[in-house]
């Protein structure tokens, strides 16, 4: 099948790390299905894997491998992906940069130090979730952002003088726009901790 013939794309892509490595601590989709699907539905698909002075370059058309080569390089370690959707399947398609850039920026917030180049625009976060809050806050915080980071969880929060609440929650690198039990638990325990600290009855 077309997807079977595109296995080289998945092979190149999976060389970026191992499932048990820190590279996959906050990743969504580790089985390569996504990259195979994009490959099969693209008139042109190219993936380059830069590692330790070598680069492996594979190009495809509609899932069919056209070229696969390895050569020396002086580029830094990283991955380059290019794809052009198959116009016979996606008629009059268009990309909405504002949605794509938001998604990519979220990835950099969750993976501190990760640099993503999107159509020539460099997206990078040095301070993770602290940058997320600073970039999205429309009012000055009442106190410096509190940032807690553990092996499997990271939290950053503050309060402003504005009314209302705003949350950015993620699970396995995916923005959970509708919240979830993880967000509900966070809200409940923040309120409970404040209540216990001040020893007052508060509704939450």
Roles of regions detected by a PLM:
Residues 17-138:
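GHKL-type ATPase core
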Residues 7, 71-77, 147-150:
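Short, ordered beta-strand-loop transition motifs
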Residues 2-9, 13:
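Single conserved hydrophobic/aromatic residue that forms the stacking wall/gate
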Residues 11-18, 78-80, 156-168:
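Active-site-adjacent bridging/hinge elements
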Residues 98-101, 105-107, 113-204:
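GHKL/Histidine-kinase-like ATPase module
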Residues 1, 89-93, 178-179:
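A generic structural signal for short coil/turn motifs at secondary-structure boundaries
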């Amino acid at each position: 099948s077309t997807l079977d013939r595109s296995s080289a794309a998945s092979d190149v892509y999976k060389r970026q790390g191992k499932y048990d490595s820190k590279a996959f601590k906050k990743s969504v989709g580790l089985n390569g299905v996504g990259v195979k699907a994009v490959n099969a539905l693209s008139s042109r698909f190219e993936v380059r894997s830069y590692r330790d002075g070598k680069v492996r370059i594979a190009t495809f058309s509609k899932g069919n491998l056209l070229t696969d080569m390895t050569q020396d390089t002086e580029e830094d370690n990283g991955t380059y992906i290019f794809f052009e959707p198959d116009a016979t399947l996606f008629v009059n398609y268009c990309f909405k940069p504002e949605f794509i850039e938001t998604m990519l920026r979220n990835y950099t917030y969750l993976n501190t130090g990760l640099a993503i180049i999107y159509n020539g625009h460099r997206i990078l976060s040095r301070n993770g979730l602290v940058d997320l809050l600073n970039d999205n806050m429309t009012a000055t915080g009442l106190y410096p952002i509190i940032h807690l980071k553990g092996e499997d969880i990271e939290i950053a929060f503050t309060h402003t003088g504005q009314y209302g609440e705003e949350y950015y929650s993620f699970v396995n690198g995916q923005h959970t726009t509708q919240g979830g039990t993880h967000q509900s638990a966070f809200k409940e325990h923040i309120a409970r901790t404040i209540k216990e600290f001040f020893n007052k009855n508060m509704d939450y």
